Amino acid sequence: MELAAVILAAGKGTRMKSNLPKVLHQLCGRPMLSHVLNSVVAAGVDKTVVVAGFGAEQVTDFVGEKARVVLQREQLGTAHALLQAEGELTDYPGHLLVVCGDTPLLRAETLAKLADYHCESGAVATLLTAEMADPTGYGRVIRTTEGNVSHIVEQKDASPEELNVHEINTGVYCFKVPGLFNALKEISPANVQGEYYLTDIIQIFVQRGLTVKAVTLEDAREVQGINDRIQLSRAEVVLRHRVLEELMVQGVTIMDPENTYVDQGVKVGNDTVILPFTFLQGKTEIGSQCVLGPGSKINNCIIGDRNEIQYSVLVESKIGNDATIGPYAYLRPGTVLADHVKVGDFVEIKKSTIGHGSKIPHLSYVGDATIGEKVNVGAGTITCNYDGKKKYQTTLEDGAFIGSNTNLVAPVKVGQGAVIAAGSTITKDVPDNALGVARGRQTNLADWPKKQRKNS
């Protein structure tokens, strides 16, 4: 079966009140257009055309090589939008899915089912319909006694009998491509809006004696359109629960799905536990038997097995196995932790590599550093990596011990097994197994407080 798709994505989305094209607003970490593109490709489509209008440059930049983009310069209706794809499909011999770019909940399985039924039935067109308890505001699908589609009637034009119909048009179609665009050119804008409606093509086909079929959708939420921020948030909830349920089926424990946020495409290993108010974003990959959260945000990170991360933020970092992070740690881009590393409370790490078994338990900043194995970094240690113009490297070799409240002024190296005395400001390299001390000598003045009071 040769199957192409046209995604109608030209609308401005006025009710979104945004400078961003509606189809580029995000759900579960991806623009809604991305979800639609993924669904049509997974349904077996071999060629995709996106019809852009408002914000066409942004839409084109996002689509890239994933599809061809054509421009609808004036928004004159859905039939007019589809007609803009004619140049890309003139000689296409197969079938065409038509979907809206603001239906990110539409499943690939639904589109595949529609296309398969359409091809097997021999119909010139097949609609995707849905049964709604309250169809108010929707166009009703009227069928013949044989079960074929007779026409679609808008609510304002429907008779009392037609108003009792609960089957509605979802705006998703499958057509035979040969002859489609000639039929589209017969549609006239004879309506209040002065637009070319794609629904009018059904009556054109029926009047020619051609068969139009319909497939009824099992879950009407799949075609829930998005026209404002309220509908966007509702769609986000539906999609988020799909993502979480898929993870749970795969063996992930999610303590509170209502308060857990995982982007589509995030990978999580089995027996990992995700606690409330945890955000897993971007291309994050989590191993098995981890405990994440509560209250953690992990963005574009690769995390191994058996790690514990609580109340912390990790961005573009790589974590080995058996690490403990937090509470209140901040791992910035370029951070790499080996196995069995401890990063404790109020620790910030940036563009640094921490070796096997090393510990940074609390109240420290580590930036542009390479730390070896089994290094202990005491509380209040600061790598002074920036002189106002350039960043410099700090190196702590295997087994080094850094006392509390130490300043390491880069570029500087502390050798293997070396010890830095607490309170030191280290500006020169410390050799292997040496003690580095760089602080003022303590002086005790006897009876000083008493003398101060006497002189005051």
Curated annotation (Swiss-Prot):
CDD domains: GT2_GlmU_N_bac, LbH_GlmU_C. UDP-N-acetyl-alpha-D-glucosamine binds at residues 8-11, 22, 72, 77-78, 139, 154, 169, 227, 332, 350, 365, 376. GO terms for molecular function: glucosamine-1-phosphate N-acetyltransferase activity; magnesium ion binding; UDP-N-acetylglucosamine diphosphorylase activity. Residues 230-250 are annotated as: Linker. The active site is at H362 (proton acceptor). HAMAP family: GlmU (MF_01631). This is Bifunctional protein GlmU. It comes from Desulforamulus reducens (strain ATCC BAA-1160 / DSM 100696 / MI-1). The lineage of its organism: Bacteria, Bacillati, Bacillota, Clostridia, Eubacteriales.
